[in-house]
Amino acid sequence: MQETAFDALVRSRRSCRSFQEATLDEASIRSILQAGWLAPHAGATGVALVDKRRFFVVRRASAAHGRLSALALERVKANRKRLMIARRFVPGLAAKTANFMKRLDALSGGGITTLQEASVWIIAAERKGFPPAEAKSIAHAFQNMWLKATELGIGFMLLSMTGMLSADTAFMAELGLAKGEWEIDGCLIGLPARPSTPNVERLPESAVAWLD
């Protein structure tokens, strides 16, 4: 089957690892948010989307960015300390978390570089419900936003460490959300520092099983 424009868009969607120090126009930001708003949500919870999905736009030059990024770094350092203690006492945990520990070490020592580079930090929040599906709903929103950003030539990067801040009272208070009632996650958008190369991988037959 011949590839379509959508196939090309999906192949072009790559995680942006470095950003230019440039400012995004509000119209582009809003179009990305609109794509996220249209993403599927957990309708089985019985709560309307307007009552359970929120987006927080944190511009790099804003005072809010300074406060929130400082709280994020504090949380990273606290989690690193807790994990270091746990690794001493839980058998096998040190080996299992080796790569993650290196990541925490880098973030704790040098800060969250891409957070300081990107034009905008978008925090998505979804109200918790039953059955719990808020994390999936945020993931759906980010997939839509990522595709829209790619279409606009804007770099996009998931900032998954934002998720751990759902349990941070001070951070959630900055957003005006009650800790324990909302799940959050984040992404970064901005003009990419360098062009990305489309993904040329093909689906291998070994990854597919046709069940009769």
Spans of features found by a protein language model:
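C-terminal helix-cap and adjacent tail motif
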Residues: M1-Q2, F6-C16, G180-D212
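A short coil-to-beta-strand element that immediately follows conserved catalytic motifs
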Residues: V50-D51, I154-S160, W182-E183
